Amino acid sequence: MQVILLENVDKLGYKDDIVTVKNGYGRNFLIPKKKAIFASKTAKKVLAENLRQQVRKLEKIKKDAQTLANKLMNISLTIGAKTSSNGIIFGSITNIQIADELAKKGVQIERKLISIKEHIKEIGSYKATLRLHKDIVIDIPFEVIAE
């Protein structure tokens, strides 16, 4: 019996896989537990169409991320911070300040997509990493100045 898995099943397959199982396992366990459906011709056609739509959606997301990455390549950021007389910042610069500065430039990015490799405690030039997509990661330079 062939079934289409609706979720990942250990030692059998992943979601949307078409697998062959014994009749009893399919009828008595997988289908009643809503882990699979019978793989009829119509179910296979619906699955194929859903997979095509998912691929189109993922391509659009990746294209949008690439467009945003190209836009971000031309942006330079300057972040002001309160400092002591010898140039040490009170507090530190985090991804929140970088996200706020990008928002001022007209680019809305979630702060969880921004990562800084080091703690920024002094005035100077640094880089932040933006993970826009699993395949698109860019570094944005920014400068910290005294207010």
UniProtKB/Swiss-Prot annotation:
Give the top-rank taxon of the lineage listed in the UniProt record for this protein: Bacteria
What are the entry keywords?
Answer: Ribonucleoprotein, Ribosomal protein, RNA-binding, rRNA-binding
User: What is one Gene Ontology biological process annotated in the Swiss-Prot or TrEMBL record?
Assistant: translation
Protein's name in the database: Large ribosomal subunit protein bL9
The record's annotation in InterPro entries points to: Ribosomal_bL9, Ribosomal_bL9/RNase_H1_N, Ribosomal_bL9_bac/chp, Ribosomal_bL9_C, Ribosomal_bL9_C_sf, Ribosomal_bL9_N, Ribosomal_bL9_N_sf
The UniProt entry, under PANTHER family, shows:
50S RIBOSOMAL PROTEIN L9
Chain segments annotated as transmembrane = none
| Taxonomic source organism | Azobacteroides pseudotrichonymphae genomovar. CFP2
Q: What does this protein do?
A: Binds to the 23S rRNA.
Q: Name one Pfam family in it.
A: Ribosomal_L9_N
Among the GO molecular function terms of this UniProt record, one is: structural constituent of ribosome
Which Gene Ontology cellular-component terms appear in the entry?
ribonucleoprotein complex; ribosome
Similarity remark? Belongs to the bacterial ribosomal protein bL9 family.
Q: Which NCBIfam families match?
A: L9
